[in-house]
Structures are given as C-alpha cells and as structure tokens.
C-alpha cells in the first residue's frame, strides 16, 4: 500500500549532513535540511525505516496526484512538487548528492494491485548538466524486475541522457518527453515513473499505482 500520513515539519539537527545516510541510525523518517557538497542547504525527505535506512527520497509519484509531470527542463533541473507528497527533487541536486561518493538507487513501484515491489541498482550516478544528466547504473537486484538496464532495442535507460518536452536528448526522431514527462529515454522506454497516469515498469505493470525513488551511499562503500 502506498504510504500516507508522512511526518510533517522539519526535524532539527545539531549538525549539517551531506545526505540522509549521515543521520544517526535511530533518527525518525521525515523532513530534514541537508547540504550536499558544492550546493546550498536543501530540504529533503529522509526514509529511515526501509532496509537499513539512510535513504534520500528524490521522487514520489502517487499517479493520481495533482502534478502532471509535464514540466520544462529548468523545472526538472531545480525540482517541483511537495516533498511530503508528489515531487521531483531536481536533476541538479540529484547530481550534486550522487557525486559525493558511490551511490545506490532503489526504485519502489506499487503495481496495478498496489503491491510494493522494488528494483535496486548497486551503483548510481547522474552526470552534470553539460553531459545531459546522463544516467549510469550498476547491477540489478530486487522483486520488480530489471526495468532500467534491460538489453532490449529502444528500451535501455542506462547510459541515456535526461529529456524534457523542451530539451530532446533521446534516441528517436520524435520527443518521448513531449508525451510522457521528463525521463532518461531511449526511443522510448521500458519504464517511466515520471508521468501522471500510466506509470510503467517494464514487465511488472503499465498502470502502476505509484512510485518512490530513493538513493544512498552504496553498500560497496558501506562495506555491507
């Protein structure tokens, strides 16, 4: 079941952290102010209860919320939405956070029956804006199936640049983002979670109920 009743109000800390993984292990989930290297303080939602905690939430989409996800490059760059509800943290901030060390990413998908599945990739990197915020992923593990590194023609998201309706960087003559929202498109997709309805995760569901995307330093670095 998609989570509701999230902790509101910023949780004050005595230190400034680079990301949610630096919070004390007994910290509750909720809103925190972090300051990644080379950028300003940033409000994020820290998920501290999922698989060891320390996750920084970069996307939440209930599928039926108010956001259309049909936004410009600049809006996707700096983020939009309500951190406690549907939102996109912002490509520039995602890039800054994930450039601090080796990160991993978890895609949480609520399927058509609202059952939670997940797809983990043990390495996650987003290049800078000059390089199109290109996505780099490691090895897959999970219950949702591999929806991002599938070796199928026109459906590979790994090593693809980010596209929006006003900045087309995909591998087709048209613009995938003009109909489906900002994402790392090939021509066009196996999975897409940045859309108002019709969230898709490869073979799992084409009408997924919702999604959450979380990142934290990789277990490769943590020694887990």
Q: Each predicted region: which residue ranges?
A:
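Extracellular C-terminal loop/segment signatures of secreted glycoproteins
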Residues: 180-199
């Amino acid at each position: 079941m998609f989570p509701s009743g999230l902790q509101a109000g910023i949780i004050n800390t005595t230190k400034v952290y680079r990301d949610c993984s630096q919070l004390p292990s007994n910290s509750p989930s909720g809103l925190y102010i972090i300051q990644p290297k080379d950028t300003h303080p940033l409000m994020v939602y820290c998920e501290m209860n999922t698989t060891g905690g320390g996750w920084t939430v970069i996307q939440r989409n209930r599928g039926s919320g108010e956001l259309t996800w049909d936004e410009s490059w600049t809006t996707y760059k700096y983020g939009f939405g309500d951190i406690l509800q549907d939102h996109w943290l912002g490509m520039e901030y995602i890039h800054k956070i994930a450039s601090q060390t080796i990160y991993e990413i978890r895609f949480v998908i609520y399927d058509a029956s609202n059952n939670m599945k997940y797809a983990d990739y043990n390495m996650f990197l987003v290049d800078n804006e000059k390089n199109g915020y290109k996505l780099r992923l490691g090895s897959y593990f999970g219950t949702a199936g591999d929806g991002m590194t599938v070796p199928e023609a026109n459906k590979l998201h790994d090593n693809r640049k980010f596209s929006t309706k006003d900045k087309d960087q995909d591998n087709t003559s048209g613009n995938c983002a003009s109909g489906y929202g900002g994402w790392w498109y090939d021509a066009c997709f196996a999975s897409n979670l940045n859309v108002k309805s019709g969230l898709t995760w490869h073979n799992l569901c084409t009408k997924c109920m919702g999604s959450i995307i979380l990142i934290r330093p990789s277990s490769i670095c943590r020694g887990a």
